[in-house]
Regions:
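Non-catalytic C-terminal interaction segments of nucleic acid-processing enzymes
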Residues: 119-280
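Catalytic cores of nucleic-acid endonucleases
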Residues: 75-130
Length: 280
């Protein structure tokens, strides 16, 4: 790479618009993040930018050649179908792929269907994803991602400044041996009022539950908070495109752990391996 932000961003090779395999306009953020990651990864590994993989006609933003590892810097929205197609193509040809998200795709208060497609899973960090921040020059691991029954996200953050550690070691963080993580979430004491509002506005999710309870001779508004406990739970989605392992056992052990306890003013959340260690 040449010095200077303009030439650096274009990687001192054929301009991308003239590349026969390049079809998408790239933002300044995307170009600069790729350049930063190239600088970081190439310190320890043979790394290529805009690497064309002829076997399945796909371009990797960055390819760590000796590790069969693709790094995709995603700064704009794409369809779930396209995300699945690209992710499956990498895996079926023996490549591991990490999707690293630009600013438009960072986690906010609620998880979108597309963001669910970028989630990874490990026994030590649970559901997690990776964010890139060009302004702060840092890679962020958002982990122990949970959702409460209002649909709001709760998660922890670990920050890795660009270039300070081995990039490959950083990306392995969720899978390395480590102390048990945890996260505290206060009990939502106004949740029953929220339920009342949802029924008033006839929200489909809560109307469906109310209908099921009605057939059993109950009503949502008769129930106490303990019926809904735990109020903060792991992500459940049909769009977990990066996760190949079966997480159903984790869901079951999670629910069994909290339902065996009295309702707590603060819910302490742990990674999957904690629940796996509990005796049933």
């Amino acid at each position: 790479l040449k010095n200077g932000s303009v030439l650096r961003a274009h990687f001192a090779h054929v301009k991308l618009q003239h590349c026969p395999y390049h079809h998408e306009a790239e933002s300044f953020e995307h170009l600069e993040l790729k350049a930063s990651l190239y600088d970081w990864a190439s310190r320890e590994s043979n790394t290529e930018v805009e690497s064309y993989l002829a076997d399945f006609q796909q371009i990797a933003d960055l390819l760590v050649v000796d590790k069969n590892l693709a790094l995709e810097v995603q700064c704009s929205s794409l369809s779930l179908e396209r995300l699945k197609e690209r992710s499956d193509a990498y895996r079926s040809h023996g490549y591991q792929v990490y999707w690293l998200l630009g600013k438009k795709l960072w986690l906010k208060e609620r998880l979108t269907k597309l963001q669910a497609g970028f989630l990874y899973f490990s026994q030590n960090r649970g559901f997690h994803l990776w964010e890139l921040d060009l302004t702060k020059k840092e890679l962020r691991l958002q982990y122990l991602i949970h959702e409460d029954l209002r649909g709001r996200l709760h998660y922890q953050t670990e920050i890795f400044p660009f270039g300070q550690r081995s990039l490959l070691e950083v990306l392995r963080t969720p899978y390395l041996s480590q102390p048990m993580q945890q996260m505290a979430v206060e009990l939502d004491r106004t949740f029953l009022t929220y339920i009342q509002q949802q029924l008033f506005y006839r929200h489909p999710k809560w109307m469906k539950l109310q209908e099921e309870l009605y057939l059993q001779g109950h009503h949502l508004l008769e129930l106490g908070l303990d019926f809904f406990y735990p109020l903060c739970r792991p992500i459940v989605s049909q769009n977990l495109l990066q996760i190949e392992e079966d997480v159903e056992g984790y869901y079951q052990k999670f629910m069994a752990y909290y339902q065996s306890q009295d309702i707590q003013p603060v819910q302490i959340l742990y990674p999957p391996r904690f629940y796996a260690q509990q005796k049933s």
